[in-house]
């Protein structure tokens, strides 16, 4: 098992803020752990340009190149162009708890955006914005310093020298397709880099980019 621990500039502890939400999903996880098979939980720090699946007919990079564990599947998605925490398990109930909006499981993202968001923009993210698939739930949103634990991205982001960039810490309690990117674009600050740091009780917690660890209890 490949593991790597960062010895300096360690990551901060996970922290969530509770938000009152009213919209719930009736979606159910269809994967069920075979009887008598023990639960497995794998945490992976997904690099940029890696698909959150084990096979790809087009020959793109997949989880198979990094994780030699069979029978586990990602709880939710993390887009190919996003980085950070991916929780994989063979337990359907755990997958549902981590991904269904009705469970109100927080997911923390560190997001580099173009420009410096105003307080009005932050308040809009916190209160919810209306996207083409409907209004978003209330979210946590705050302007933060660049994370001390940040790893270099390969390739680097494309940024315009004439426009500054900044970092946001965003906490979501739902999981729509490319939601963070659409939310920041909606308030006028496009996402340049997106890193998921935590899902519920699971976090990167010093796990290096491209590495995995077994988090089975």
From Swiss-Prot:
It comes from Escherichia coli O6:H1 (strain CFT073 / ATCC 700928 / UPEC). One of its GO terms (molecular function) is 23S rRNA pseudouridine(2457) synthase activity. GO terms for biological process: pseudouridine synthesis; rRNA processing. InterPro entries: PsdUridine_s_RsuA/RluB/E/F_cat, PsdUridine_synth_cat_dom_sf, PsdUridine_synth_RsuA/RluA, PsdUridine_synth_RsuA/RluB/E/F, PsdUridine_synth_RsuA/RluB_CS, RsuA_PseudoU_synthase, TruA/RsuA/RluB/E/F_N. Belongs to the pseudouridine synthase RsuA family. The keyword rRNA processing applies. It catalyses: uridine(2457) in 23S rRNA = pseudouridine(2457) in 23S rRNA. PANTHER family: PSEUDOURIDINE SYNTHASE FAMILY PROTEIN-RELATED, RNA-BINDING S4 DOMAIN-CONTAINING PROTEIN. This is Ribosomal large subunit pseudouridine synthase E. The active site is at residue 79. Coiled coil: none annotated. PROSITE patterns: PSI_RSU. It comes from the Bacteria. Keywords: Isomerase, rRNA processing. Its EC number is 5.4.99.20. It holds the Pfam family PseudoU_synth_2. Responsible for synthesis of pseudouridine from uracil-2457 in 23S ribosomal RNA. The lineage of its organism: Bacteria, Pseudomonadati, Pseudomonadota, Gammaproteobacteria, Enterobacterales.
């Amino acid at each position: 098992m490949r593991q790597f621990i960062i010895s300096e500039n360690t990551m901060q502890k996970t922290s969530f803020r509770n938000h009152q939400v009213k919209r719930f999903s009736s979606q159910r996880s269809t994967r069920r752990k075979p009887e008598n098979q023990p639960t497995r939980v794998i945490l992976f720090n997904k690099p940029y340009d890696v698909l959150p699946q084990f096979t790809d007919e087009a020959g793109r990079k997949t989880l198979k190149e990094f994780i030699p564990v069979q029978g586990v599947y990602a709880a939710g998605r993390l887009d190919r162009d996003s980085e950070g925490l991916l929780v994989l398990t063979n337990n359907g109930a755990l997958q549902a708890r981590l991904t269904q909006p009705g469970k109100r499981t927080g997911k923390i993202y560190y997001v580099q955006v173009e420009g410096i968001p105003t307080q009005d923009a932050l308040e809009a993210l916190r209160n919810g914005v209306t996207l083409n698939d409907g209004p978003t739930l209330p979210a946590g949103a705050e302007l933060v310093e660049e994370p001390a634990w940040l790893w270099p991205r390969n390739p680097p982001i494309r940024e315009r020298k004439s426009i500054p960039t900044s970092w946001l810490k965003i906490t979501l309690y739902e999981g729509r397709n490319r939601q963070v990117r659409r939310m920041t674009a909606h308030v006028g600050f496009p996402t340049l880099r997106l890193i998921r740091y935590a899902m519920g009780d699971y976090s990167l917690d010093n796990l290096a980019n491209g590495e995995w660890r077994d988090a089975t209890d």
